[in-house]
Amino acid sequence: MNEDVLRSSHLPIKLAALHFLDLPLSVYYSLPQVSLSTGTKKLFAATAFGAVSLIIIARRFRRRKGRRKANSPVEQETFEFLTTIHLSKESDSQSVPQNSENPYTCNVVSGALYNKLSGSLPSLVSVRSRHSSSSSTCANGSNCWEEAGDAADVCNLLSLPVATPENLYLMGMELFEEALRRWEQALTFRSRQAEDEGSCVSVKLGAGDAIAEESMEDIISADFIQKLESLLQRAYRLQEEFEGSLGVTDPTTHPTNVLLADKHMDLSVREELEDTCLRDSISIASTDSFVSAAELSEHREMRSGHALGSLSPHPFYEDALQMAEEGKISCRVLRTEMLECLGDADFLAKLHCVRQACQVILCERATRAFLADTGKRILSAIIAKARKSPKRFEEVFEEMISFLEHTDHWENTENELSSRGVKHMNFYDVVLDFILMDSFEDLENPPLSIQTVVNNRWLSNSFKETAVASSCWSVLKQKRQHMKVQDGFIAHFYAVCEHISPVLAWGFLGPKCTLQDFCCFFKEQVLFFLKDIFDLDKVRYFSLETLAEDILHLLHRRSDLLMAYLATDVIHHLNGCSDTSVHLVHSALLEAQVQ
């Protein structure tokens, strides 16, 4: 085929077939023989148009269906919510044993107990639905406007609240109440489980082996129950403070009262059950039992006494807390945050207990002598570290102690302290709070003139020390002019401060040295001691005697720690070791021993 034939004007169909379809020559020569009518051509065109339209419509529906599936987390949450309700209803009709072989049914309680303690389950599901709906509707910005109507319908169906501070507060309270229910469930479940296991063992093995098994269970459960009840008491007090911001709760419906009432009711039931089980064990064991009836009765009394005691591990503190809530306890300065208390009522309740314990401690002459001697030795060591003679300080300190030993001066001393806000005469209010803590606070915020002198790099350390001492003496001189009693307790106290205040001020504000290390260590020990005596886990608030015993024990431990620090410092000084890092290491080791 030549090029002229292909370019002829009367062969358009053949040229199109050759150029676009690349047909073989056999098909090319058969094209002139094919002839299509007009109707066939119209039918072919309609069929092609319909096929293309169907393809486009199908692809359009497929895209819309994919977008609907992408926005279905709210529907999934709704389905999970309905499934959870269905499962909770099914759990009422059957109970699964705890030690089941099925791993998916382990640690499941009975349906009735689960139904009782899962009152806030819908609230938790609503919280999850709220978070999922907000994240799903705003995750894809291109789809938010297209499906605004569907999202509005879902929100109206689930009645989701608006995220306001009040709603978030209520949501947090619901979750907190859920945690309280779980802890109460653990408390009741653990105690009942121990009773049931003990009763079963007593029936199967006999009275002798039953007592051994039950005693071991009591040791384990007693520690756990005591810690859990302490946690619940703190949680209840925290819940009262939270609810106080919105309204006053009814004391009869308080969880503490309800829990105590339930436990008192359970005690009577447990005693009856235990008596029955013990009688059964005696009848079954017969002569093979090595436990007499008197021993069984004594064991039952010990168990009931421990159960009653575990209801209130800190009765002395609970009574003081009631007084604090009624506004019957006052103080000069609230140190709630510094001593890490749960609230002002908690601080005042513990303060009331500590005041009484301090009075018991100071009744012993040996304890007063120990405190006076320890204080004099520590303060004399601080003065000696400043390379000054502590002789005059020890003299005025002994004069102040002898002045306090005479009871004739106590009335005037009480009046002097009362005029300065100290309304209670005890070791905490006078020594720890009024003298030590106020001094530490004054040293943390010194006057601007002293700060300017100390921070001046062009002045020598000796000049700075002299300036700090002069400033302290001028302040004490001004205070002496306002004294009403010239030979009272405040006068003796100012005489002591004239020797120790400049040294302490330079120790805290001066350069890094052994004096500053010991001053900081002394302050830390005082703060640690205060935090310990205001901690329910460090001291026993069971009674006045136990609290006084623990406070005195902590006093000896902290004093021994300070004396050990001084002893190690003297040893290193004699050995020629002057590196301050050694002192810090030893202080850390000594602190680890106390903690």
Swiss-Prot record:
Segments traversing the membrane: 11-31, 38-58
Keywords recorded for this protein, A-Z: Membrane, Mitochondrion, Mitochondrion outer membrane, Transmembrane, Transmembrane helix
InterPro entries: Miga (IPR019392)
Listed name of the protein: Mitoguardin 1
GO molecular function, one term: protein heterodimerization activity
Topology class, membrane: Multi-pass membrane protein
Organism listed in the record: Danio rerio
Any one GO biological process: mitochondrial fusion
Pfam families assigned: Miga
Location of the protein in the cell: Mitochondrion outer membrane
Glycoprotein is among the record's keywords: no
Function: Regulator of mitochondrial fusion: acts by forming homo- and heterodimers at the mitochondrial outer membrane and facilitating the formation of pld6/MitoPLD dimers. May act by regulating phospholipid metabolism via pld6/MitoPLD.
GO cellular component assignments: mitochondrial outer membrane; plasma membrane
Family: Belongs to the mitoguardin family.
Cited PANTHER family: MITOGUARDIN, MITOGUARDIN 1
Main location as per UniProt: mitochondrion
